[in-house]
């Protein structure tokens, strides 16, 4: 049985001081034999987090697909690997909306991360307009097709997919657990076509979108939802513990 994989995403929040306080409150209250708990923090906090955390996987929130060069403000896989980062979020809807990132960009990032033995958390999800037009599955599967293009199955099983409907991120709106399960099920079916059933079963699929301690359990009991990617509800230590220890 796969361990559930629950990651918080602090986005552009926090300080080294607040992260230190946060980890002092949560790290020794997580049983890493039962769950994979993680936290994506701003770049300037990565080393603090990596130094202090024993049971929380510290992740970066983005990476560039080039290894070096004239890309002001960007960060490379080599730089993240040097400080010990093992997980990186790529393709978050905020990156897509604000910085015009595409599925092809995400595909390039996924490849370079996997080549360097870093786990990409690959985000996908539809807008409200796409949902209302009844094209969610078609849209999300097209994203998956592009983002996994050219990735071998032995690498694909190391990736994590985070299904985050854009209309549910930070809005307080949530997909019902059955709706989220249906999309995650179709993502897995699509992965079976790209690779094979065994490969598809091994790939972790998270749900994200206004997940909080009060509703996480109903999502994680679904057969095709292997974890959660959580934004605002991961900022407070008490809420974070309510998420990662949801089953206690």
From Swiss-Prot:
Signal peptide: none
GO molecular function: triose-phosphate isomerase activity
Keyword set, alphabetical order: Cytoplasm, Gluconeogenesis, Glycolysis, Isomerase
EC number of this enzyme: 5.3.1.1
PROSITE patterns: TIM_1, TIM_2
Pathway(s) per entry: Carbohydrate biosynthesis; gluconeogenesis; Carbohydrate degradation; glycolysis; D-glyceraldehyde 3-phosphate from glycerone phosphate: step 1/1
Any single GO BP term: glyceraldehyde-3-phosphate biosynthetic process
Catalytic activity line of the entry: D-glyceraldehyde 3-phosphate = dihydroxyacetone phosphate
NCBIfam families: tim
Task performed by this protein: Involved in the gluconeogenesis. Catalyzes stereospecifically the conversion of dihydroxyacetone phosphate (DHAP) to D-glyceraldehyde-3-phosphate (G3P).
Family: Belongs to the triosephosphate isomerase family.
Name of this chain's protein: Triosephosphate isomerase
């Amino acid at each position: 049985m796969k361990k559930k994989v629950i990651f918080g995403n602090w986005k552009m929040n926090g300080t080294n001081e607040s992260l230190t306080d946060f980890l002092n409150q949560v790290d020794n209250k997580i049983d890493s034999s039962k769950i994979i708990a993680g936290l994506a923090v701003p770049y300037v906090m990565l080393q603090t987090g990596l130094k202090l955390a024993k049971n929380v996987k510290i992740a970066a929130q983005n990476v560039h697909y080039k290894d070096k060069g004239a890309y002001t403000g960007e960060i490379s896989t080599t730089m993240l690997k040097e400080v010990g980062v093992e997980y990186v979020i790529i393709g978050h809807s905020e990156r897509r909306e604000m910085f015009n990132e595409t599925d092809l960009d995400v595909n390039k990032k996924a490849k370079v991360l996997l080549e360097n033995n870093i786990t990409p958390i690959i985000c996908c999800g539809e807008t409200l307009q796409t949902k209302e037009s009844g094209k969610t599955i078609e849209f999300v599967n097209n994203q998956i097709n592009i983002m996994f293009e050219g990735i071998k199955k032995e690498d694909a099983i190391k990736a994590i997919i985070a299904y985050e409907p854009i209309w549910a991120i930070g809005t307080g709106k949530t997909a019902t657990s059955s709706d989220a399960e249906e999309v995650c099920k179709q993502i897995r079916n699509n992965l079976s076509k790209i690779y094979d059933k065994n490969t598809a079963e091994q790939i972790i699929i998270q749900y994200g979108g206004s997940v909080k301690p009060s509703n996480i359990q109903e999502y994680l009991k679904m057969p095709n939802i292997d974890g959660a990617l959580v934004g605002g509800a991961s900022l407070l230590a008490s809420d974070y513990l309510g998420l990662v220890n949801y089953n206690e």
